[in-house]
Amino acid sequence: MLAYVYEATRACSRLQDVIVATDSEEIASVCREHGWEYRMTSPQHRSGTDRVHEVAQAIEADVYLKVQGDEPLARREHLDVLLELMEREGVEVGTLKTPCSPEDVTNPNAVKVVTALDGRALYFSRATIPFDRDRSGQARCYKHLGFYAYRKPALDAFCAWPESELERSERLEQLRFLDHGIAIHVAETPFDTVGVDTEEDLRRVEAILATGK
């Protein structure tokens, strides 16, 4: 699964370096076997953003992208759109959304996002948002895709703050930014992904990869 993620990330020509950040010797061994650059990080990190921050302490860059190893359907196009978003003035944190499929609308493992007219995230939730009270069919639901881009000051700030109440409740680390007034800008992509969090997710991904769609 990691190989799919690495190769998709490596295909993005705008990235200077692709580094696997891990606290797992098993993953490090896979990296050595394939000749991939990797960094061993602390096993104490509570989130992927904390792990990216540790790497950012040692490697200077304009923008840091986080692509999670459980996203085997990652595509170069995801990263291209995200990097374009980060070129806008004032964007410190960026991520992606895609129209939510009917089966994911009520799935708590598929995180939903609501955005303002200017693309800033208003909220992320495992619940169905927005809620279509009158069942009008006019409420558009968007799924959040777990790709992130950060500038260093935003990473520094995130790691200086404790976990927020909303973050603990939803188990969504990005809510820490919103709780502290840091805007997360969201770009839209037509390319959905399936993060592998459960056995059912794994079966879905295997079926998609088998058909090549």
Give, region by region, the residue ranges found by the protein language model.
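N-terminal glycine-rich phosphate-binding loop and ensuing alpha1 helix
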Residues: 1-21
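Class I S-adenosyl-L-methionine
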Residues: 10, 28-32, 37, 178, ...
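Short, high-confidence coil segments that cap the C-terminus of an alpha-helix
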Residues: 15, 61, 88-91, 182
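Conserved alpha/beta core of the MobA/IspD/sugar-nucleotide pyrophosphorylase nucleotidyltransferase superfamily
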Residues: 17, 139-213
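Hydrophobic/aromatic residues located in beta-strands of well-ordered beta-sheets
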Residues: 18-20, 64, 121, 184
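Short phosphate-binding loop-to-helix
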Residues: 19, 25-84
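Conserved core of the sugar-phosphate nucleotidyltransferase
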Residues: 74-164
